From Swiss-Prot:
Coiled coil: none annotated. PANTHER family: MATURASE K (PTHR34811:SF1). Belongs to the intron maturase 2 family. MatK subfamily. This is Maturase K. GO terms for cellular component: chloroplast. The lineage of its organism: Eukaryota, Viridiplantae, Streptophyta, Embryophyta, Tracheophyta. It comes from Saccharum officinarum. Pfam families: Intron_maturas2, MatK_N. The gene is matK. One of its GO terms (biological process) is tRNA processing.
Amino acid sequence: MQKFEGYSEKQKSRQHYFVYPLLFQEYIYAFAHDYGLNGSEPVEIFGCNNKKFSSILVKRLIIRMYQQNFLINSVNYPNQDRLFDHRNYFYSEFYSQILSEGFGIVVEIPLSLGQLSCPEEKEIPKFQNLQSIHSIFPFLEDKFLHLHYLSHIEIPYPIHLEILVQLLEYRIQDVPSLHLLRFFLHYYSNWNSLITSMKSIFLLKKENQRLFRFLYNSYVSEYEFFLLFLRKQSSCLRLTSSGTFLERIIFSGKMEHFGVMYPGFFRKTIWFFMDPLMHYVRYQGKAILASKGTLLLKKKWKSYLVNFSQYFFYFWTQPQRIRLNQLTNSCFDFLGYLSSVPINTLLVRNQMLENSFLIDTRMKKFNTTVPATPLVGSLSKAQFCTGSGHPISKPVWTDLSDWDILDRFGRICRNLFHYYSGSSKKQTLYRLKYILRLSCARTLARKHKSTVRTFMQRLGSVFLEEFFTEEEQVFSLMFTKTIHFSFHGSQSERIWYLDIIRINDLVNPLTLN
């Protein structure tokens, strides 16, 4: 059977941008350094607890590990496993992190080269804007107002190790590297708990999030690319022009070959993709599929997705992982926002000459709110408040200087307001700001062994300025004579920023210290 052209072209395009270096050698540092997005600056890597590791550190770790010859020692001395010696926890975790970071750099090189090889310079700023997490919300607001049903999909697991390794075979042609990756995945003791966790597919161990998230996203992208290919090809089946007619003939021939291998599956489901109003969004371990079709069509989509997973990825998908809801009667958690599309009823009084009548107008509105309970729980886990939201001091930070404590609390508050700037209602944000401000005051008072009121009176306006958000800073410039003011005038204003490239730490499992 002939392969789909689009699928093979995708593989060729990925191979075109990749030079295959030997894994764990010094050449990787030079390669990643020269093509880094930061130019002459060392490439920064997010590792344990979201701390940044420069490429210079990775280079030193790779050279050190390469000189140790761990694999040779494991063959000559099988009883002395120096790479994953669980009797020495420090070295076991240290070298497993080296392996994870090293593999993460290598497999991400093709993606960085693909971004830098843009033929037109004018498209680069536009592409960088689309990298922002907030760029998806205007799209949802524009599209979801015209849709009827929403499917919440939990992406299936567990993922077989061999499938993850096979996905990298066309990116890395160095066979020893693939064997080393397979050895690392099978030997790593926490692998089962990382991937098959019942709570979330993204509750990975912090030291190895970079590699495992990349492997997971590569795996899911193969799943999504096939659906996208069928969507694009089937959309031209309705057209009758001469150019698309040839494409229909070619695609129909491929359907015949495909039906031989998977009888009764392809022909019955290809018409699902002809829906002109169908949108798919994935975030972390979940996905959303919205459509304007009927409830019967959505139920058939649910059956199709379950069968698709069994045919192509060889695992059982539980039907209850796909939930169907009417868009106007439900809300969904999306990237930390609680989103919904309610119907607002407006009564308009119309006066025509001597007669007057009321017009009942129904309008849909895309709302994005801040979930209060999860964020208060995150602050509680970070020891900023109790479970009920009562602010407490953070004893761990009492050894820092006063300005460092103020800066840390202020930065967390500003980041929260920056990330949730698109919220329709900001009452929850001001509640979180109150918790952080009072927790900061109690931490400083505990450090200096004084009361909160005495310490806040001594700092005065300096203490309040550390918790100013971007909107409040602009507002304060307009009224420079006023120090104390209440900034609640723009609670319904939504601002989407194009510089947010990752989810806030308080939305994900906490990594705050």
